[in-house]
Amino acid sequence: MLDNAEELSMDTPYGAPSDTITLGGIGGRRLAFIPRHGKKHNIAPHKINYRANIWALQKLGVSRVVAPSAVGSLREELAPGRFVVPSQFLDFTRTREGSFSEDGRVIHISVAEPFCPELRTVLLDAAGDAHDGGTYACIEGPRFSTRAESALFRAAGADIIGMTMVPECQLSREAQMCYASVSTVTDYDAWAEKAVTAKEVLATLADNVERTKALLAKLIPTIPRDRKCTCADALAEAEF
């Protein structure tokens, strides 16, 4: 998918990223790709070294993060195979390192609007029929929800459910990088009559891999070279 692709191994103050980083180009634009679960999908969501991944991208000069993900649907109208570009998240994670605050540094980052509006707009234009907006409930994983939990998430206003957006999104904001996500619905969560299985998720993902690649190939050349959002100044009012 990438022109002139090369693999780069990096170390960070937080340990190693999930895997080697692929550097390459699409449509004349340079980019870096980190498979958050590892190339062999051998890292569980709660074990991903999110800080190392985001630190590495920032060190490489990345200014924007487009994050594909697989999600379950909490709404009947968001059927499997649908793209969703969420606008909010709910954090139900418990054990993850969610900030670069350390060694006396305290970052009170604002995530009132957690996704870059400029990047979301370009992503929606490229995606065409993607669902615009919605709340992503991020759970700890790797297990799926109970029916009671799924009902709770629906009652709380969540529209989709996944395991990786938090703390990836807020770390990107602390790193002053734009962040937007395109989520592929793979299943209806446990609230539906038939409970989700890993086999079902993988089958739907496999059916949509090429669609996601095509979307990224269309999107990346259209991203403005200069940022007009405020993401690059996210720390200005976040520290005392």
Swiss-Prot record:
SUPFAM superfamilies: Purine and uridine phosphorylases. It comes from the Archaea. GO terms for biological process: L-methionine salvage from methylthioadenosine; purine ribonucleoside salvage. Its EC number is 2.4.2.28. The record marks S145, A198 as: Important for substrate specificity. Keywords: Glycosyltransferase, Purine salvage, Transferase. Phosphate binds at R36, H37, S69, A70, T164. It catalyses: S-methyl-5'-thioadenosine + phosphate = 5-(methylsulfanyl)-alpha-D-ribose 1-phosphate + adenine. It is an enzyme of class 2 (transferase). PROSITE patterns: PNP_MTAP_2 (PS01240). Substrate binds at M163, D187, Y188, D189. GO terms for cellular component: cytosol. GO terms for molecular function: S-methyl-5-thioadenosine phosphorylase activity. Pathway: Amino-acid biosynthesis; L-methionine biosynthesis via salvage pathway; S-methyl-5-thio-alpha-D-ribose 1-phosphate from S-methyl-5'-thioadenosine (phosphorylase route): step 1/1. Pfam families: PNP_UDP_1. Catalyzes the reversible phosphorylation of S-methyl-5'-thioadenosine (MTA) to adenine and 5-methylthioribose-1-phosphate. Involved in the breakdown of MTA, a major by-product of polyamine biosynthesis. Responsible for the first step in the methionine salvage pathway after MTA has been generated from S-adenosylmethionine. Has broad substrate specificity with 6-aminopurine nucleosides as preferred substrates. Homohexamer. Dimer of a homotrimer. Belongs to the PNP/MTAP phosphorylase family. MTAP subfamily. This is S-methyl-5'-thioadenosine phosphorylase. The gene is mtnP.
